């Protein structure tokens, strides 16, 4: 298959280094993320996202839901693996035609200790 017809899985958006604010064992599995960060990174609600704990190396695949300002909440089974105060990166990926992927720049959102966006840019 030539470069033009191939599909590549590429980073679409990332939020880092976010701080986990709460865990909720009784809620449906997933991640609640500050709505402003969802929009800034180009995520969509119910999208599959990857979450990486930058200190332990734990990696999870989660459903994304919109949360309150400053919120990074792990729900359900994920709450057993990562604790409040942990620093995490949250990323989404998507398929693109190889040719388009060569020019693609993902949305990268850096946040402060209160999970407020301090810088948004395109990677590259």
Segments predicted by a language model, with ranges:
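Compact, glycine-rich, soluble single-domain proteins
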Residues: 2, 8-10, 19-21, 25-102, ...
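Short, glycine/charged-enriched hinge/interface segments at domain edges or termini
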Residues: 106-124
């Amino acid at each position: 298959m030539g470069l033009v017809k191939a599909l590549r899985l590429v980073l679409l958006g990332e939020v880092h280094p976010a701080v986990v604010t709460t865990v909720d064992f009784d809620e449906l599995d997933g991640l609640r993320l500050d709505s402003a960060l969802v929009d800034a990174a180009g995520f969509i609600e119910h999208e599959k996202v990857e979450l990486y704990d930058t200190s332990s190396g734990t990696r999870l695949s989660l459903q994304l839901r919109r949360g309150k300002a400053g919120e990074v909440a792990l729900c359900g089974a994920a709450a057993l693996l990562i604790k409040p105060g942990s620093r995490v990166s949250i990323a989404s990926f998507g398929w693109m035609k190889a040719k388009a992927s060569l020019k693609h720049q993902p949305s990268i959102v850096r946040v402060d200790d209160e999970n407020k966006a301090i810088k948004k840019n395109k990677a590259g």
